[in-house]
Amino acid sequence: MHHLIQEITKEQLRTDLPDFRPGDTVRVHVKVVEGNRERIQVFEGVVIKRRGAGISETFTVRKVSYGVGVERTFPVHTPKIAKLEVIRRGKVRRAKLYYLRELRGKAARIKEKTAQ
């Protein structure tokens, strides 16, 4: 039974998304349906966590909009994500960056990872 579930979910997994991790700044292009029309909405921010595995894997992106912190959680393998761009790679030592919620302004910046 377990192998059957794995076989079915394997077909649903996305392989077209770039590799990203907590601390990276990403731009997520989300398909939004309003009435009978569909449009693309862009959400740009820092990945503060990535959890789960397989089909149920999710990631949370945080941005500050007009002085208010906004966090949005996306399933990694959803067809609602049209495109995901990694803008910059962050250098962090934690898997969950919840401490960014308390930081304001320049203190909330993350060092950029240098290419090696």
Swiss-Prot record:
One Pfam annotation, family name? Ribosomal_L19
- Keywords on record: Ribonucleoprotein, Ribosomal protein
Q: Which PROSITE patterns match?
A: RIBOSOMAL_L19
Q: Which GO terms describe its cellular component?
A: cytosolic large ribosomal subunit
Disulfide cross-links: none
Q: Under the GO molecular function aspect, what terms does this record hold?
A: structural constituent of ribosome
For this protein, the parts annotated as crossing the membrane are none
Q: Name one process (GO BP) from the record.
A: translation
Domain of life of the organism encoding this protein? Bacteria
What is the annotated signal peptide range for this record? Answer: none
Q: Which NCBIfam families match?
A: rplS_bact
Q: Which family does it belong to?
A: Belongs to the bacterial ribosomal protein bL19 family.
Report the protein's function.
Answer: This protein is located at the 30S-50S ribosomal subunit interface and may play a role in the structure and function of the aminoacyl-tRNA binding site.
This protein is called: Large ribosomal subunit protein bL19
Q: What organism, scientifically named, is this protein from? A: Geobacillus stearothermophilus (Bacillus stearothermophilus)
